[in-house]
Amino acid sequence: MEMKTINPADTVAELIPGSYYIASPRFAAGADSVVVDVVCHGTCPQASFRTDAVFGVDAAGKPFDVGFRQKFNVGDPRQWSMEGRDEMVYGPDIYALNEALQLEAAAPGPFDMAPSLKNVRITSQKKCRDGRILSEKTVKADNPEFYRLTITPAGVEIEGASRAALAMARRTAKRLFETNPSGVPEAVVEDWPDYPVRGMMIDVVRNFHSLAQMKKIVDGMADLRLNRLQFHLADDEGWRLEIAPLPELITYGSRRGYTTDERLFPAQIYSGAGDPDGELNHGYYTRAEFVDFLRYCDERGITVVPEFESPGHARVAIKAMDFRERTTGDSSFRLHEPADTSRYRSAQQYRDCVLNPALPGPYRFFDVVSDEVIAMYREAGVELPAFHIGGDEVPGGAWSGSPAATAFKAEHGIEDDSGLHAYWVERMAEMMARKGVKIAGWQDIATDYNDSYSARVAPQVDYVNLWVDRNFRKGVKHGSMALRSGFTPLICDFGHFYLDFAHSTHPEEEGLNWGGVIDEFKTLDGYAGNVAPRSDADKTRILGVQGQLWAETLRSDSQMERYLFPRLFALAERGWNADTTFTHGRFNALMGYRELPRLARRGYSFHLRQPGMKLEGNRIVMNSPYADAEIRYTTDGTTPTLSSPLYTGPVEAADPQAVRARLFYHGAESVTTLLPRR
C-alpha cells in the first residue's frame, strides 16, 4: 500500500510495510486540532497488518492519543470479498446447517469424549461413583501409549505401557467422572493413539503471551491427550527467550513500538498500541522461567520443540546483532552483509529479514543459541526432541545482490540461491548432530532438492511440518516428495489445522482468511492420510498432526482460547484416531452438551456457533446449534445483548432486515445473525 501527503510541507515515510509516520510543521503550532490530508493507494495483504489506531509518538518513543476519529460506513453489514462478492454468512444458511446438526442432537453417552476411546466394553450397569484410583501398573504393549482402565464399583485400576500412557489414563479417568457426576458404568476401556505425535505450534512472537497463560493452554492440551508443543520463540517481529551470552536479543529484540529509526527497538507491526513496554509488544521468558516451563510440560506428558526461524523470518535477530555491533563494537555475530544490494520482499512484505549463509556470523550465532537451549533442557532434566530451524518462506532474490554470497557460491560450486538455502540447512543439521540433537523444519527444507541432499540431510531431521500449498494437489505432491526423500512429515496443513483462521467469512469473526476459513468441522475432517501418502504403506511414516496458532491477530488470552476451543477437540480427534469416528452432528452434540460447559467451568473461553434465522410467511423463526443455548434478539438493527429479549417462538417484525440475533451459552456469545437483503 502507498501513502502520499497532499500538502508539500508535510512528510510521509514508510517505516515497515503498511506502517507510516507523518511529520508536519503544523504539529508544532499549538493548535487545538490539525488536519493532514493523505492519499492511500493499494490494499493491505492481510487484515493483521492494520494498526489499531493513529497515534502520536513523543521523543521517548511512547505513543499518545491524538484524538483521531475515523468514520466507518456502518449502514451495510455485508462482507465484501476482493472479487466483489457478498460473503456475509446469512441466517437462512445457518438455519439449515443447525437443523441438520440437530438431527443428531441426542445427549452423549457416558464414555463419549474427544478424542474418542478406541474400545469400551461395559461389563454391567453397576456404577463407580468416586473415581478412586485403586492401582497403577506398567504393562507391555506394541503401542507405547496404550492404556487400560478397569472400572468397578470400588474404583479404577489403571494399566499403561509407559509413564506417558499412565498419565493419559489418569486424565481420561478424571474426565469420565467429571462429566458423569452420577457415576460411570462398570467397564473395561482400552485406548491408544494412531499417531505418535499430536501437537500444537504456538507463536508467542507476533504478540506475546505469558507463561502463566501458556501453562493454562498446556493443561488443556494434556487433557485432550496431545503430547507436543512446537514453541515458536523467534521470528521477524521479536525474540522471546533469554540467551545470556547475547543479551541484545532481549534488550532490543523483545520490544516493539513506534519508532522512526529502529535504533532502540524494532518498529511496530501487527496489533497493539505501539508501546514498546506494552503487554503484547514487550515480553520474554528468562532462562529460569523457561526451565520451569519445560518441567511443567514434562509432568503433563508434553514435549517441547523450540523454534527459531532461519534463514528467513530473521529480521529481529539481524537487527539485534546490528544493535550489539553498534553498542559494543562486536561484529562477530553479524547476520547480514552491509554491502548487500539484494532486492526482495518476503511473504510478510519485509525487505530485510533474511540472514546470509555466506557469512560466518550466522553459524557462530546459532552455535551460541543452541548451546544455551541445550543447557536449559539439561537443567530441566527433560528431553530436547529437536531444534527447529524454521527454514520456510525465503523470498526469491534474497542473496542476489550479496558479494559474499556470490563469491561463496562460486567457491563451493553452488548454482543458485536455492542451493545456498540447502547449504544452510545442511550446515545446521551437521552442527546439531555434533551436539547429539536432530533438527526440524517446515516443508521447505525437504522438498524440491536432489536425492544427494536428501540422503545427507534426512537422517538428521526429526520431522518436517507439511503445511502444504494453496493448491491442494501440489500439497499432496509435496507430501509425497517428503516421504520419497526419506523425511518424516508432521501434517500441519493450512486447510484444516491453521487455528488462527476465522471460523467463517462473517465480518465479526476474528482471524485471518488468506487460506480460507476453518471451523471445528473442517478440522475434524483433516485426515492426515489424505494429505501426504502415496500408498497405504506410506501412512506408517506420518508422524502425526499439529495445529498452528499464529499470533498476528491475537490481542488477549481470551482470544487465544476462542481460537483454540472447540477446534482443539477436533484436532485431538484426528491425531488420536486416523479414521472416521464422529459425524458433524454427533461431534457438535458432544461439544454442546458436555465439552463447552466443562470448558466454562474450568475458566476457558471458547468460540460459539451462531443461531440460524429465516422467514416463514410474515414471521421470523430462529434455531440454535446447541440444545440448551439462549438466543437473544433485537428488531431495531442493534446488536443483541444478554438483556435483549429471549427467543421463545416465531417473531413478528415490521422490518425483517432489522432483526438481529446472537447465541449466548455459558458466558460465551456468537457473532450476529441477520437476514439477507431482498
Describe these PLM feature segments:
Residues 111, 116, 142-378, 382-386, ...:
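Feature activates predominantly on carbohydrate-active enzymes
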Residues 11, 84, 88-91, 95-190, ...:
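Acidic, contiguous N-terminal accessory segments
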Residues 8-37, 42-50:
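Short beta-strands within extracellular/lumenal beta-sheet-rich domains
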Residues 578, 582-678:
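Short, compositionally stereotyped local motifs that mark structural "simplifiers"
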Residues 18, 48-49, 54-101:
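Extracellular carbohydrate recognition and processing domains
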Residues 346-463, 469-474, 479-481:
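Active-site neighborhood of glycoside hydrolase catalytic domains
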Residues 438-446, 451-618:
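Flexible, acidic glycine-rich loops studded with aromatic residues
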